[in-house]
Regions:
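Compositionally biased terminal segments of proteins
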Residues: 1-237
Length: 237
């Protein structure tokens, strides 16, 4: 493993403690984002936060109140950094010298496919995560998004036109903009990362990313996949 600046083993220990407790609440949130993908599907990188989504749920404020009332009985919560709005909440729990960020989002109504039942509750799928990542790269420069897109493409088979159609159900995006973000991604952003499991071959990564950009723009089948693993049939580890 790469020499890590953060102690991900300790962070994962805190994550595991939270997820074990979380499973008893029975709330309809599903774990998504980099932690869902990295810890429970691909094991391709480390992820320090927990992101939980529901989809346009009118009871979101009620869920957050339930979480707030229960979490302080089991964890040390940093309320000074907490944030609560109508459709978004952020909570930090601390243990020793580490802080775990947990975010709750009342997302748009559409999602790609169904969630997966897992030991801690509901887990997102690579297809929905990928369609979210396409939207994310338009609005932010986050190397983890590109890293995740590449690893999803290498590990699962799918058609890019189908995935883009899923992404457009959630936001107004243009395929030219997505292709440009993929093609012009600055590889220098991957030079000093501390969350990769294995070292990154930048030349290989760039070749794969350029092929992904071409496949995406043409609406082709994903040609960089090295496995016979349809993304719609993806199973957690």
């Amino acid at each position: 493993m790469n020499s890590l600046k953060k102690d991900y083993r300790k962070l994962y220990h805190i994550q595991d403690k939270f997820l074990s407790w979380w499973g008893n609440l029975g709330l309809p949130f599903y774990l998504t984002g980099g932690t869902a993908l990295g810890r429970f599907y691909l094991n391709h990188r480390c992820s320090e936060d927990l992101d939980f989504f529901v989809n346009r749920d009118p009871f979101f404020p009620r869920y957050i109140e339930e979480i707030k009332n229960a979490i302080e009985r089991h964890f040390r919560v940093n309320l000074q950094q907490a944030l609560f709005t109508d459709d978004f909440s952020r909570i930090f729990i601390t243990e020793d010298d580490l802080s775990l960020k947990i975010e709750f989002v009342n997302d748009v109504s559409y999602r790609s496919g169904n969630t997966v039942s897992y030991y801690f509750g509901l887990l997102d799928t690579p297809l929905n995560i990928l369609s979210n990542k396409l939207n994310a790269i338009i609005s932010r420069d986050e190397p983890k998004d590109i890293f995740d897109i590449v690893y999803i493409a290498v590990n699962y088979s799918f058609n890019w036109q189908v995935v883009f159609a899923e992404a457009k159900q959630k936001a107004v995006i243009n395929e030219i903009d997505v292709e440009e973000r993929l093609w012009n991604f600055p590889l220098s952003l991957l030079e000093n990362i501390d969350w990769n499991i294995e070292s990154v071959d930048l030349d290989y990564f760039n070749r794969v990313l350029r092929k992904i950009a071409d496949d995406f723009l043409l609406g082709n089948d994903n040609s960089v996949c090295i496995k016979d693993s349809p993304i719609t049939e993806a199973k957690p580890l």
